[in-house]
From Swiss-Prot:
It comes from Shewanella sp. (strain ANA-3). The keyword Cell division applies. Belongs to the MinC family. This is Probable septum site-determining protein MinC. GO terms for biological process: cell morphogenesis; division septum assembly; regulation of cell division; regulation of cell septum assembly. HAMAP family: MinC. Cell division inhibitor that blocks the formation of polar Z ring septums. Rapidly oscillates between the poles of the cell to destabilize FtsZ filaments that have formed before they mature into polar Z rings. Prevents FtsZ polymerization.
């Protein structure tokens, strides 16, 4: 029996949500450009859902926002939290209207493997622990990236980027002896350096998800 020419299957993906809190596109783009400069590769080509719940202006220039994001190689795939007028505007632009769904109560499968490295990870290097945790006995330098489908443990300074729960595991954590990261991310929720500095003093800590927000906890001495 020949295979059908197409199949329609259900699947779930982790998407970043861009919250727009101002109708002033110049101000929005100036702030976005500042964030992109801190982690350009992380956002490059990233599909975004735009949350417009803070925008009540029905004349908001959604087309202009879409074009400005495209010029920065960011792609709007849909909007959420919009007024009826803005939702209609989105439909004419070919954007999906996304409704926030309830989180699944079924926990993801536990990582099956652990990748252990006894070395420093230098600028330009990338390490990925697929289907498991990543343990590094060393430092992660500026410009380096460490990624794991499970948790990340760094017995040294974290100065680069660390992305745990890359496959969507919201129970993953990032632990480091010194939190000085350019970017940290768990299951798609991320902090840039400026966010991390507000919650940490370059000391050891454990970053995890609390609902849909990242938090950092001190490690016992």
């Amino acid at each position: 029996m020949s295979k059908p020419s197409l199949e329609l299957k259900g699947a779930s993906f982790t998407l970043s949500v861009l919250h727009i809190n101002s109708s002033d596109l110049n101000a929005v783009m100036a702030e976005l450009d500042s964030k992109l400069a801190q982690a350009p590769q992380f956002f490059l080509g990233a599909p975004l859902v735009v949350n417009l719940s803070a925008i009540q202006d029905n004349d908001f220039n959604l087309h202009g926002l879409k074009e400005l994001l495209l010029s920065r190689q960011l792609v709007i795939v849909g909007i959420t939290g919009a007024t009826t007028a803005l939702s209609n505007q989105a439909k004419t632009l070919g954007l999906a209207i996304v409704k926030a769904g309830k989180q699944s109560v079924t926990p993801p499968p536990a990582p099956r493997q652990t990748k252990v490295l006894k070395q420093n990870i230098r600028s330009g290097q990338q390490v990925y622990a697929k289907n498991g945790d990543l343990i590094i006995f060393g430092a992660v330098g500026n410009g380096a990236e460490v990624i794991a489908d499970g948790s990340i443990h760094i017995y040294g300074a974290l100065r680069g980027k660390a992305m745990a729960g890359a496959a969507g595991d919201s129970s993953a954590v990032i632990i480091a002896h010194s939190l000085e990261a350019e970017l940290v991310s768990i299951a798609g929720q991320y902090w840039l350096a400026e966010n991390l500095q507000q919650h940490s003093s370059d000391k050891s800590g454990c970053i995890r998800l609390n609902g849909e927000s990242l938090i950092v906890e001190s490690l016992p001495l």
